[in-house]
A protein has these predicted regions:
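Glycan-recognition and catalytic cores of secretory/periplasmic carbohydrate-active enzymes
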Residues: 1-269
Length: 269
């Protein structure tokens, strides 16, 4: 249990699932669980957990209101078994309670707890849906592959089709910020915003440089899960269309290929 971090004061796990995290870190923590369907698919406790975990994102658990079934969006980039984080995240939310850094090999090079906090100062924008949440489709996929229960496939289709529509409105490019009212980019239309989004280049406190930390490739998992359960190539086509859209903005500068910032006027149909 944590002392300072709200999400962990009653334990970092609840109902066998992380209370609140983003889907890069949820995904890293669930690598073994996501493979259990290949080895013990009939194990009762695995089946029960697969369905329970999926329910956290299907509006089935009132303690985990992560999903808006009307707007078909996950309400925050930080989510889990205790629901979404619906405020700006603090560095402490990301790092956790103070700890002794000595003895740990920090991948980003931090040597003090203060540097860990400084690393996450700019990671505050998390409210609203985010392409990183497409990784959450893995949970209903796990549940669907057990006995082909239609509701799991339908949720994947509904959620991913909503993202296809957002990409269509955004000239083929997947946005990294969808507001709680469903508006792409929020009131200002800044679709590239949010932590881990297209325009996310925070300062690394170890070297003082801005470093690109978008997590666009993780969204592919959602499209591959939708392709797996439906067989429809439109989910693969979305990725191809986006690559074409990005590459169409490429130009050569000093012998190197660069992509200019996209000026996208959202088409609301």
């Amino acid at each position: 249990k944590t002392t300072d971090v709200p999400a962990g004061r009653e334990g970092m796990y609840y109902k066998d699932f992380s209370t609140q995290s983003d889907w890069m870190h949820h995904g890293e923590g669930m690598q073994n669980f996501n493979r259990m369907g290949l080895s013990v698919p009939t194990l009762p406790i695995y089946q029960e957990r697969a369905r329970r975990f999926a329910g956290f994102y299907m509006a089935e658990d009132p303690e985990a209101p992560n999903y808006d079934p009307k707007l078909k969006l996950i309400r925050s980039m930080i989510n889990g078994s205790r629901g979404p984080l619906l405020r700006k995240a603090t560095a402490l939310d990301w790092v956790g309670d103070p700890f002794d850094v000595q003895g740990f090999g920090a991948l980003h090079g931090e040597s003090t707890f203060e540097q860990f906090l400084a690393h996450y100062v700019e990671y505050s924008d998390v409210v609203g849906d985010h392409f990183l949440n497409l990784v959450a489709t893995t949970l209903p996929t796990n549940a669907y592959l057990l006995k082909n229960e239609p509701k799991y496939k339908q949720w994947i289709v509904d959620y991913m089709d909503a993202w296809l529509e957002r990409m269509k409105q955004n000239k083929g490019i997947i946005p990294s910020h969808v507001a709680l009212d469903g508006k792409i980019g929020g009131a200002d239309g800044q679709w590239w915003k949010s932590a881990y989004g297209w325009g996310f280049s925070p300062v690394n406190p170890v070297n003082g440089r801005r470093e690109n930390r978008n997590r666009i490739p993780r969204a592919v998992i959602g499209f591959t899960n939708a392709l797996l359960v439906t067989g429809k190539q439109k989910y693969s086509d979305a990725g191809r269309t986006m690559i074409d859209s990005v590459n169409s903005r490429a130009r050569t500068v000093d012998g190197q290929t660069v992509v200019q910032e996209a000026e996208v006027e959202i088409d609301e149909g």
